[in-house]
Structure formats: structure tokens, C-alpha cells
């Protein structure tokens, strides 16, 4: 299934994407995103963004696309929990350890392979299927792996 996916760094961009036909929005929160110094939504704003997107029949994904250290995994749980409860549609993940962690603690949460994961062949794509990935997002990869 093809999906028009748009980035959003703030509520204004998110609303513009929804109002201009995006099927889904992706954004970073206050932690674990590759664009740590970019403008990102607060926890409260992100929960409101989830609600707004769902009211308009769209999906919303959050990036967890940094490499995590062992000590950060408990932080990841506390970080994702409010968004999971609010109905976040999925996470875009880079770190394979985070994949295992999210799969164990948030088993219903769809995971998308971040472009930083650099999956460029069918062996990599097949492996991701075995660890609960539902989407592969790599700029370099054609749709017909």
C-alpha cells in the first residue's frame, strides 16, 4: 500500500500536511530523534497532534531513530508510553536493540525501518519481517525489492 508521508516539526506544519492531502505524518518528539536540535513537539503537543490527525482520518508516526545505549532503554519505555496510550500509529526505528525492546513492551505498536537502517536488499527486508516491522522506508530503495 502506498502512503503519502509528510514530515512535521510543529503543529502548523502538521495541520498543513493534513489539510493538503498527506495520508500520514511523521515527527520527532523531545528525545530519541536524529534531529535532536530541530523544533520538536512537547509531550502535550504530541498527544494533541495524535488526536488531531486521527480526527481527520490520517496516521501519525514518531521517530525513534537514534542508536540507544542500555541505560536509555528504561527512558524509552517512559517516553513512548503516553503516545502509545494516545494511539500513536507507529514508530520509525533505526536501532535493532530498540526494535526488540519496543516489540516486547509495546507489542501492538507497528514499527517502520528508518532510512538510517540502510536496508537495501531482500535479505534485509525479509529479516525485518521476522522482527515485526510493517514498513520499510529507505530513500535509496525501489518499491520492487
Give names to the regions the model predicted.
Residues 17, 95, 128:
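Conserved, mostly hydrophobic/aromatic
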Residues 134-143:
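Conserved small/polar residues in nucleotide/adenosyl-binding loops
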Residues 13, 122-127:
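Catalytic cores of alpha/beta
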Residues 4-7, 25-27, 60-64, 91-93, ...:
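Hydrophobic faces of well-ordered beta-strands that scaffold small-molecule active sites
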Residues 3-24:
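N-terminal basic/disordered segments at the start of proteins
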Amino acid at each position: 500500500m502506498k502512503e503519502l508521508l509528510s514530515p512535521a516539526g510543529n503543529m502548523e506544519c502538521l495541520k498543513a500536511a493534513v489539510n493538503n492531502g498527506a495520508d500520514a505524518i511523521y515527527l520527532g518528539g523531545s528525545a530519541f530523534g536524529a534531529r535532536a536540535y530541530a523544533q520538536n513537539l512537547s509531550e502535550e503537543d504530541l498527544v494533541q497532534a495524535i488526536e488531531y490527525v486521527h480526527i481527520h482520518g490520517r496516521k501519525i508516526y514518531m521517530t525513534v531513530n537514534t542508536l540507544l545505549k542500555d541505560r536509555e532503554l528504561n527512558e524509552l519505555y517512559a517516553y513512548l508510553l503516553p503516545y502509545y496510550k494516545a494511539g500513536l500509529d507507529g514508530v520509525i526505528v533505526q536501532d535493532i536493540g530498540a526494535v526488540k525492546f519496543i516489540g516486547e513492551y509495546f507489542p501492538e505498536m507497528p514499527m517502520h525501518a528508518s532510512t538510517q537502517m540502510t536496508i537495501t536488499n531482500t535479505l534485509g527486508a525479509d529479516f525485518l519481517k521476522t522482527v515485526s516491522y510493517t514498513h520499510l522506508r529507505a530513500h535509496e530503495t525501489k518499491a520492487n525489492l
